């Protein structure tokens, strides 16, 4: 290929990329997943509406992840609604599709499935996306309990993004042996499983300082940003580094 032909080829590629980014920026997207809202915003494709849990007070809110305002979403006439199997309810997905909306259902339970679904999301909006690889970190070789609710105490099971993210850092989630992805258990059971540490995320339920004392005779407890543990997407590469740095000293 001559220099002029090569230059024309590069120019066409730049024009195609520019058009794809232009198309993405003007798509009307409703996001019912906080991590998707964060990722789309980082891509320069801010949703026209999102949930009240998306930490975007500047955007129009259409309810929560478990109770979205379906009629309000339909009235917005979006080009695309994004949901996640792990985050949203199937009945809301069915209601949105029955209303004739284009709904993209993601199902992220690991770093691998995250990358697959980020490509699907990018493809759905015409965005040229290169997956940001998560840098491998040294294994921490710890066993951890991760409380996400109190009364009753609940944790995360094996087939969840948070558990798989910890696994990537060499941390074994002691609740992986339960059949449920959100098992209920009492602290005597936790103590019997002998975790090395207790990782206390800031969400979905923020455990008060007074309640941390209940872990005192089990293992050291450390608070972490729940978004780093449970929100997948553009934040994940840096989230792994932050969590690893915080947990490796314990």
How should these model regions be labeled?
Residues 10, 14-250:
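N-terminal ligand-binding lobe of clamshell/alpha-beta domains
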């Amino acid at each position: 290929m001559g220099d002029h032909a090569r230059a024309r080829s590069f120019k066409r590629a730049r024009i195609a990329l520019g058009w794809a980014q232009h198309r993405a920026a003007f798509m009307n997207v409703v996001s019912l997943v906080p991590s998707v809202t964060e990722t789309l915003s980082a891509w320069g494709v801010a949703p026209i509406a999102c949930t009240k849990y998306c930490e975007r007070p500047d955007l129009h809110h259409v309810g929560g992840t478990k109770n979205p305002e379906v009629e309000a979403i339909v009235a917005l006439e979006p080009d695309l609604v994004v949901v996640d199997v792990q985050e949203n309810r199937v009945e809301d997905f069915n209601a949105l599709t029955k209303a004739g909306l284009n709904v993209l259902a993601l199902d992220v339970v690991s770093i691998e499935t995250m990358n697959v679904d980020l490509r699907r999301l990018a493809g759905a909006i015409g965005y040229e996306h290169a997956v940001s690889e998560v840098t491998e970190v040294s294994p921490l070789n710890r066993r951890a309990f991760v409380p996400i609710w109190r009364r009753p105490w609940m944790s995360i099971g094996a087939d969840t993004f948070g558990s798989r993210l910890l696994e990537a850092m060499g941390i074994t989630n002691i609740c992986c042996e339960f059949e449920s992805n959100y098992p209920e258990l009492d602290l005597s059971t936790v103590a019997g499983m002998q975790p090395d540490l207790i990782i206390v995320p800031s969400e979905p339920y923020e455990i008060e300082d007074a309640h941390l004392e209940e872990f005192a005779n089990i293992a050291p407890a450390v608070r972490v940003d729940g978004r780093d543990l449970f929100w997948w997407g553009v934040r994940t590469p840096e989230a792994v580094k932050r969590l690893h740095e915080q947990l490796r000293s314990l």
